Amino acid sequence: VRLEHDCLSRRAVLLAGGAGLGALGLAGCGGGADVPELTGAAAGDVLVALADVPPDGAYEVTLDGRRVLVTRTAEDAVAAYDAECPHQGCTVRATADGLACPCHGSAFDPATGEVLEGPATSPLAPVAVEVRGDDVVLS
């Protein structure tokens, strides 16, 4: 006995599967926190309020098209790094353990940018910043 209307066609299954994969891909593109973007910033320009830089993480900002991580090295001191991993160019992120590349697992010291664990062999490129009053500014 053949049930004509109770079966899905191969085409219906493929279309539904493709739509599901497309929705999953789009979900991965969104939902993240908005990263502030600065263009044409110069020495002395405010990057972020010091209070917005978490003591155990990093503040992310896009500076002239490149992602920058600002980390706290002491209560009133910070460091900043280009977030591009020197290994293969993935974007380094703040984690519970410091700064890490999600692509290949390189880990970096938030205070110095030095490599803690490879495969990266070079430190993160520093971005010159300083604390001025209650703000982190480009220097």
Place the predicted regions along the sequence by residue.
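N-terminal pre-ligand scaffold of iron-sulfur
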Residues: 15-18, 22-25, 29-96, 122-139
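N-terminal secretory signal peptides
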Residues: 1-8, 23
